[in-house]
Amino acid sequence: GNVQNNYVSFAGYIWRIVRINGNRSIRLIYSGTSTNASGNETSIGTSQYYQKAYDPTYLGYQYHENLSLKDNQTITNYNNLTDNKIYYYSDSYTFNKETRQFSLTGNKISGTWKSVNQEVIANYPYTCRSESENGTCVFLLRMKEYSSPSSAKVNYITYSSVDYPSILNNTDNSTIKEKIDNWFATNIQNKQDNNGTSYSSYLSDEIFCNDRTFTSGDGYSISKRTEFSSYYRNVRQKKPNLICNQTQDKFTVSSNNGNGKLTYPVGLLTIDEVALAGGVYLAVNNKYYLATGQPYWTMSPVVFDSNYAYAYTGNISAAGHITTATATTSYGVRPVINLSPDISITGGDGTKNNPYTVALPNN
């Protein structure tokens, strides 16, 4: 809601209290350097969630690549053709494993999908959806049936994850995790209070949930639409939940209470937390404290849309509502931390003009 007494001054920055965790640690979201900050002043900058949006593998805060060439996947609808574009089509293709790029080879034709679809299906079924004869692509389409000038039934040909368990091994960082970690190292980890104590000592190692469980699809392949559990809870059911069911999705520094994959105790909000604070899917609300006037990321994967080969992550729009965006979009980044239950409030009343200040015991 429109909370006015959740301002905290910590480590030279302003934060907003999101909630009190079960162990009395306090979850905070970055809110700039002044209580008057708004828009892009409330984030540490912008970032893509990841540089690839064509594969659900990369919706992980971390992920793992166990990839293989797949050229006989389930037929699916593809709705991302442009009806007036002249695409090239061929009767064969090659794949470069080093660059992970497909290329058209052999005999080729070109034309709009509407004008050449019969000849394509019969003799030249492969396309990169490129207007260049030598264009390359990260996935290929085998055209199977004409649906409309901008859509077709296709087989995806991909170099992609072999199964769902593989992507949960969490060996590689997302783009946004790299940005958050770099910021934290400079501005919290390597920064000290007036007593020479690192500000990281004030923090508690709590779970950041990158919930990759799903309610439909398979969570890893390009040929199936996947709806992740966070989407089902918050969009279809409107029943947010703070439980993180899958150990691999519980991002923590220590493996005592999570996956032990974080370098630093910092992450992002989930859309469940946004919903509990007052955010609603596609319903404008610029009156609650998480609405800043700048769109910014959560760490909740929501949908992989096989009809467009787009992976979507949850975010808060400039107007304050919960929405989704492709993972390659550049949105604001607002780090989230947890103050230790051992800290003491040393001043302030949490209001805009008098934010809380905190200290460690005997410090």
Feature map (PLM): residue ranges:
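Long, domain-scale functional regions
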Residues: 1-363
